[in-house]
């Protein structure tokens, strides 16, 4: 589905965006990974790895929007959240070098593949849906000293009833991918886990494997 970067007479999907934002926040707060963060049973490096998934997701989607020539307001929101999350992770790691060796979970690889498909198809509706969910997840993430960032901007690429149905379907798919990050972290960092045996991959390892 090829969709222009914006349309003049777009459909109002703001109620859908707001309900999705609330649902994502509630689902994350009930998730096992958040429970382990609350009970301090998740190691600090595992907590950082979890936040890194959302940071990477924000960056991937910003690049996707720019490549597809899509909604610039969504891209700005993604960059703002990525900067805020990156700064929080800089403090957590006490260095910015983690950006070259950050942890990439299996669910992030799946997410990257899906976004690449949407970019190739120039599917602005699908990319916007993933941006909405990722912004909701980033906004809900526990970050010390989290600055106030404006809510998700209006989505202006949904032009038809078919677009609206596709948007709703992609919101659901994006939500499942976001929740999968927490499941990956819990599996990769069980209580008393062996860090060397973790299934987590670093960006450097992935690059080496692709050479």
PLM region spans:
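Metal- and O2-centered redox machinery and metal/ROS homeostasis
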Residues: 1-211
């Amino acid at each position: 589905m090829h969709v222009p970067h914006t349309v003049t007479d777009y459909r109002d999907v703001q109620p859908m965006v707001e309900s999705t934002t609330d649902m994502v926040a509630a689902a994350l707060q009930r998730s096992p990974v958040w429970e382990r963060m609350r009970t301090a049973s998740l190691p600090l490096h595992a907590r950082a790895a979890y936040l890194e998934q959302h940071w990477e997701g924000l960056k991937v989607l910003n690049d996707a929007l720019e490549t597809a020539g899509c909604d610039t307001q969504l891209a700005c929101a993604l960059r703002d959240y990525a900067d805020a999350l990156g700064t929080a992770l800089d403090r957590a790691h006490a260095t910015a070098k983690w950006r070259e060796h950050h942890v990439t979970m299996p669910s992030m690889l799946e997410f990257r593949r899906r976004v690449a498909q949407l970019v190739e198809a120039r599917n602005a509706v699908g990319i916007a849906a993933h941006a909405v969910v990722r912004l909701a997840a980033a906004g809900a993430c526990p970050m010390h000293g989290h600055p106030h960032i404006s809510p998700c901007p209006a989505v202006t690429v949904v032009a038809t009833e078919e677009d609206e149905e596709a948007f709703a379907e992609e919101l659901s798919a994006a939500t499942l991918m976001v929740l999968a990050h927490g499941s990956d972290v819990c599996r990769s960092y069980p209580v008393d886990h062996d860090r060397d045996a973790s299934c987590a991959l670093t960006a450097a390892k992935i690059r080496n494997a692709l050479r």
